[in-house]
């Protein structure tokens, strides 16, 4: 009998499944590389007219968002499982997680520390926002503020590139699912 799209093979992690502890380790490592000081320097360059207190507050909000990413991902996986949508959601989250785990990306955390995770967090949040655009909201979370906040910090050029990465991932997953469904219909 052919495997259904949302069934996992025994003993195998589903496609795109990344250990969230790896993402938490990346966050911890980035915090160790310059911590808040490096993040505040980055923000000061992006927001040159901001007062010191505003820069510090922006850094604190940034860290809160970054620290929330593993929770967002875990909750999205859980929701996908509960709704039988793992064949769609897991590969999309896998793309976002792989970007998060790349040390050298558009804003490399290997060089920038915590500031290098701003683009990663933006990409995850934009992925979740796109999942909410279906016929029924996926998580129904209001992620507009964090997305806009991070877009301000990463800049429009990088944000556009990240948005394109999300759209490309969605198109890839759609093509893969169409191919799978075609094969399944031929097997039936």
Q: How should each PLM-predicted stretch be described?
A:
Residues 91, 96-124:
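Membrane-inserting effector segments that mediate pore formation, membrane fusion
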Residues 1-91, 129-188:
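Terminal, membrane-proximal amphipathic helices
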């Amino acid at each position: 009998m052919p495997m259904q799209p949302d069934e996992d093979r025994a003993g195998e992690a589903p496609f795109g499944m990344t250990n969230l502890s790896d993402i938490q380790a990346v966050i911890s490592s980035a915090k160790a590389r310059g911590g808040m000081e490096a993040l505040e320097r980055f923000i000061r360059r992006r927001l040159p007219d901001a007062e010191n207190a505003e820069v510090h507050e922006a850094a604190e909000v940034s860290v809160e968002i970054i620290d929330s990413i593993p929770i967002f991902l875990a909750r999205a996986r859980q929701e996908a499982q509960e709704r039988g949508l793992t064949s769609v959601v897991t590969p999309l989250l896998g793309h976002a997680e792989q970007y998060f785990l790349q040390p050298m990306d558009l804003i490399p955390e290997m060089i920038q520390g915590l500031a290098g995770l701003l683009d990663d967090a933006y990409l995850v949040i934009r992925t979740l926002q796109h999942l909410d655009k279906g016929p029924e909201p996926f998580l129904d979370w209001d992620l507009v503020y964090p997305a806009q906040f991070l877009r301000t910090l990463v800049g429009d050029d990088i944000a556009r590139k990240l948005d394109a990465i999300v759209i490309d991932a969605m198109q890839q997953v759609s093509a893969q699912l169409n191919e799978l469904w075609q094969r399944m219909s031929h097997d039936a």
